[in-house]
Amino acid sequence: MSGHNKWSSIKHKKGAADAKRGKVFTKLIKEITLAARTGGGDPDGNPRLRTAIAAAKDENMPKDNIERAIKKGTGDLEGVNYEENTYEGYGPGGAAVLVESLTDNKNRAVSEIRHIFSKHNGNMGENGCVAWMFDKKGYIEVEKSAAEEDHLMEVAIEAGAEDVRESDDTFEVITEVEDLETVRQALDGASIQYAFAEITMLPQTMVDLDDKTSEQMIRLLDALDDCEDVQKVYTNASLSDSVGEA
């Protein structure tokens, strides 16, 4: 299993539990609100909003919640003014960590994120210290049991996917950001079920971590992911096969 695939899978399994506590909905609402604020409330003309709505529907968010979040973004309803920022640093073993934040209090967010890095054997760096190690891409994970490789490859590439990669127990469909929804819809049309689809930051190269360091890295990533001001967390750590399987 690739390092990106490993953390993504752990994160989404964790998200299923978090959803019961409302954490996933909170993050999705923030993203929908900001997407509508920056690009308008019409998903047909706003790819970021379209992707955010699709993610919300995947999590079974009620339609009313989605519509309210859009209206808060467009100003039709009063809402919180979120600020978007990216923070960068290093985790255990020197692996890069990229943190996307949406917050109504930047000072609180910076302080909390810096504290989490320090507490978990990492350190927050300057802007630009690790961002260059990642590429922004669309990413769709398909369980091997859900599709034949040749069929998936044919459908995905025909729809505009950049690559289809094989991992231990999944296929990873990679797209340009603007092609993610088209490829997702093509998979839906071909009745190919996928575990999740998202816009992500794919690492260009990976940093191998041993069992102990992988466990430390997971604790850092989990703590960042649990921070109320954090939307997404990315790493180029190649995590040990022994972690995250429970």
Swiss-Prot record:
**Recorded superkingdom:** Bacteria
GO annotation (BP), single:
regulation of DNA-templated transcription
Where found? Cytoplasm
CC terms in the record's Gene Ontology section: cytosol
- GO MF term list: DNA binding
Please provide the record's keywords in A-Z order. Answer: Cytoplasm, DNA-binding, Transcription, Transcription regulation
Q: Which InterPro entries match?
A: Integrase-like_N (IPR017856), TACO1_YebC-like_2nd/3rd_dom (IPR048300), TACO1_YebC_N (IPR049083), Transcrip_reg_TACO1-like (IPR002876), Transcrip_reg_TACO1-like_dom3 (IPR026564), YebC-like (IPR029072)
Membership in a protein family: Belongs to the TACO1 family.
Question: What's the protein called, per UniProt?
Answer: Probable transcriptional regulatory protein Dole_0371
